[in-house]
Amino acid sequence: MSKTDSSHPGRRQLLQAAGLGSLLAALPPARAAAPAESGDLLQAQSEVRLALLMGNSEYPAPFDLPPIPKNVHDLRYVLEQRGFVVSDALNGNLPASRKTLDDFIAKAAAAPADATLLFYFSGHGIQVDASNLLLPAGLDPSGKPDTLRGGSVKLIDDVILKIPPRKGGTIVAIVDACRTSLKAGADGGLNQVVAPADCLIAFSTGAGRPAVAPAVADRSTFYTASLVKLMESTSDQTQFRDLFQLVRTDVRETMLHHPVEAIRRLAQDSFIADSTRASCTLAPRGIATAAGPALPDAEQEEQDFQALTDAVWPADVVERADAFLKAHPKSAHAPAAMVAKNGGAEALKALRRREVRLFKTAFDLPAALATDEDMQRDLHRAGRGDKDAAARIAQIQRNRRDTANWMNRYEGWLQLASALGNGIASYDLALHYRSQNQPLLSSQWESRAREQGYTPPPSLDNVRK
């Protein structure tokens, strides 16, 4: 995590004074009444929610990160308001970090299958040999790769894959960590990942980019500040997956309009890997949201939102989302409509790129897959700019091989996923064209994958060439 330079007091003062952008100021408040006390909420809700927050600020000079305790403190408060039972740990060394993780994983294993589990890390993060490492307190981020590899927590192997899979539940992993190498010439940033089924992974910025941390203890990082603000203020009906898209937009716009040029130059565009299936709203299951006065157009509002929900083709998504926001600007569904509109616009832009050969007919569900809920879900999400959904559809097309144009559809969906920022899809295209004896295309797509911040594991990179 990059730290704003404390040797420039003017820059520090500007960063302290800057608030988050007002892009989402028009969204409706989370509740019509004050939130319930967290103890009352836990007694009333039917959904089990567990969270572990790990934050490390104490690293060898000059790598300390003063804002991390505030990050953890503020996020804990808002998560408890959202019905989570929260554990936190600050500045643990490697043994302490592993013990903390083991305790949380044991609690997760004992939780119901439909529980919501959340893991958050804020501190330094490094990529070594394509593996994403979370550095414990006291470990020098500029150390040798072998030292970092042996002295860190592996995000995927030690955290994500050890949390028991959910059936009807959701796992959320949030990493607000350094995204650029702290050694010249080393691999840059954390690596792109594929989230396991029923899991969402959010990084505070894209591969090869720094996540900015103030040099003072009374300011949060941009990403966590936005996450806390929007988790507290966004409507109860908002899905967690939509929340992270709202945070992504808010952080980017806030930093792009920051008065400090260096901050504008480092504007973060968070990475999100989403393989969730269950509905998971900010309000826990079993909690009735505070009802406002009955509105005369409530029935029409629900009909209009259903029409938006049913839309698949990106142009239809944008049109219906725009109409919904104009007709119902204060609706509790407004955050979801905003995410749909922005995502549909991204999908349309990607489909217009010259290298993407995918057409409207590809968004029509084949008869053989008419009852496939996963395929239906991914078609809807791809039409809203979901890079991971597009990549999953590509794999479905590849596995079918029972239609004359399966290969064209496979390539087209991977091309769309790549255009939406999926570096792993770009690398899959490189491998595909290599297998088709098209070395020029293979080289082009491999270069694209690396530009997007994806580093293939050494075994895959070396063996499959």
Language-model regions, residue ranges each:
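N-terminal secretory signal peptides and thylakoid transit peptides that target proteins
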Residues: 2-22, 28
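Active-site-proximal C-terminal subdomain of hydrolase catalytic domains
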Residues: 55, 72, 79-80, 171-267
